[in-house]
Curated annotation (Swiss-Prot):
InterPro entries: Ald_DH/histidinol_DH (IPR016161), Ald_DH_C (IPR016163), Ald_DH_N (IPR016162), Aldehyde_DH_dom (IPR015590), G-glutamylP_reductase_CS (IPR020593), Glu-5-SA_DH (IPR012134), GPR_dom (IPR000965)
Enzyme class, spelled out: oxidoreductase
SUPFAM superfamilies documented for this protein: ALDH-like
Single biological process term from Gene Ontology: L-proline biosynthetic process
Name of the molecule in the record: Gamma-glutamyl phosphate reductase
Species annotation: Streptomyces coelicolor (strain ATCC BAA-471 / A3(2) / M145)
Amino acid sequence: MTTLSPYDSMSPVTRAAYRAKSAAADLAPLPRAAKDDALLAVADALEVRTSEIVEANAQDVAKARAAGTSEAIVDRLTLTPERVRAIASDVRDVVALPDPVGEIVRGSTLPNGIDLRQVRVPLGVVGIIYEGRPNVTVDAAALCLKSGNAVLLRGSSSAYRSNTALVRVVRDAVGGAGLPADAVQLVPGESRESVRELMRARGLVDVLIPRGGASLISTVVQESTVPVIETGTGNCHVYVDAHADLDMAVDILINSKAQRVGVCNAAETLLVHQDVAAEFLPRALAALAEAGVTVHADERVMAHAKDSGANVVEATPEDWETEYLSYDIAAAVVDSLDRAVEHIRLWTSGHTEAIVTTSQQAARRFTQLVDSTTVAVNTSTRFTDGGQFGFGAEIGISTQKLHARGPMGLPELTSTKYIVTGDGHVRR
């Protein structure tokens, strides 16, 4: 008589989730050294097997180009040997970070003599649903392993070959280092049904983190029965105040918009105080033109566009809410700082907003009134990043207020539990 495994009657996604849950239980109590050794093995394996990864990625890139995918999205999909080495370097950076598991968040001895400690513990099984950025595959795996979590990865079908190769390399390295290989799994299948099944795996998957565009995030938030940490889109604003250093403002604007356009911390809207519009806008528009940026302008910006050389088109209502992820920016003139704040409140995705000003009073009011994960004063929006904040690699940038907000590093991939120690204490 053949004995059936309990896994035999399960769908591939459910089977993967059960295996992840088992692996998470094995991973949670491991010491830092064991996890770090596994991560170092992952970094080494990525470098040794770079050609295997790049060859798989080339198939995804060719398919994307044949489908007419924009070059900005193709760039996010592409893995070169240099980019694979950078991913390996990022994994080594995670090794150098403190292990949050077991950290005592707070502790005290109660009046009755009981010792109370709140300590960090892994979340358990983390599901990541993301679009065509294969570097996320390794970043997520590294952060989850370091924080003692198992991870189920569901990337875009456009990067399926790349992700398959990356996960194969990571699993081989993790298993070879003596950790459960099932702590890192690619969700089986390329169909949308596999995504829906992952979203319904409550009780097996402890949290889902979607990374991608507004449509993806909205779908996960609305349809998931698993708790979701929402990583929002990046409709980021740069506001040039009446008291701005205009040279600084041009530099910050161009860096925020054009350094890398296909990322969530790139600026998508420029707001300019009316008192500096006549002096600032011709310079800003010329600089944007030199950077190849098309400006979607309101009528007050249009009035300053003559002889700037800028590619300026009339803004539509949709422009104010658009995360372009391209060489486009919306622009408007506002009557006051408070009007800028009103505009941001109406259209922001809650990611990052910047003010350029020499006025401490204006900076203070802006930072108090704007309710986003990051409010920047005289700095580029591009600094909203786990690496730039010193957190190491990030799992995403949360734009919600519960559990985590802003760049999510290792501590944000943990929860806490209370350890209560007594000496025969009973409650009377």
